[in-house]
Amino acid sequence: MSADRIIAIFAIILAVGFDFVNGFHDTANAVATVIYTKSLKPGVAIVMAGLLNFLGALLVGTAVAQVITKIIPADAVTLPIVVAVLLAALIWNLITWWFGIPVSSSHCLIASLFGAGVAAAGFKGVEWGELRYVILGLLISPVVGFIGGAVMTWAALKLSGEAKREDQKAPPQLMRWLHIIASASVSFSHGSNDGQKTMGLITLILATHFAEYGYTVSIVPPWVMALAASAMALGTIIGGWRVIRTVGTKISRERLSHSQGFGASMSTALIILAASHLGAPISTTHTLSSAVAGGTLSAHGRDKLNPSTLKLLALAWILTIPVAATLAAVSYYALKLFWHA
């Protein structure tokens, strides 16, 4: 087996590692609200999230994966680019996880693709039509999440009659079960969108370095779908408690109510599922964090939002693109020093 083939296999392992980290970094997206409202015990919530992440990644088509494979032109893809992209995304994901900052794995990946593509071939190394489509989705989803969280929370409070007087130790059973269903839907939708990003990267590696076996960028092999789904599910079950605490307790100064948790989770699930069907790789992290903020505003007013946490989230959102792109570019140049390609 040639050195390039061995390194290509290593790149696939890195992609699976990214999916695993994505799972435990983004566990908070699915289970933070349902844990901190005491609707489910933490262990039950995390196992549920892992199983539904697996099913979402496996069952909801590959439209997002197809978009990921097209951000860098197929004839320009080299192993140094792919390895640089994965290293940059992994490093930034792990740094932010360590500090409990809920950043977007999607932002990491898209920015890394941009940075490595430009480093390798200048601005011709990126398909700008595809990139504009992706960036639009990443920009719009937090805004829609904020509005959706506010509207859903308002509706849930009105329909349930709970207002602001919920008993956190004994949640109303109807709202509790609706919240659990909404949380399960976030897990499923997260798998459907984020799992496809790794599928796209692995398919890109296979199409460019194992083409004689019939692999192309237009078809995601079933074994790749199963591998990506399994890695994300395992990462989700292991969990990322640092991020869970931030989403569950620090965005709002008031403890999350059951109606608020339902509103944030259900609006996030609907937005992510719609994006998955449209092939838009958007951020579950930013969508849900915005929905929690919108729900807090709707339920308790502006004074109950935690400005320091919101500023930290905004800073991480702003920094992720330049930092991940720079990490990918630096990684690419470093790899090229030791690469014959």
Language model regions located:
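Multi-pass alpha-helical transmembrane bundle typical of ion/small-solute transporters
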Residues: 1-341
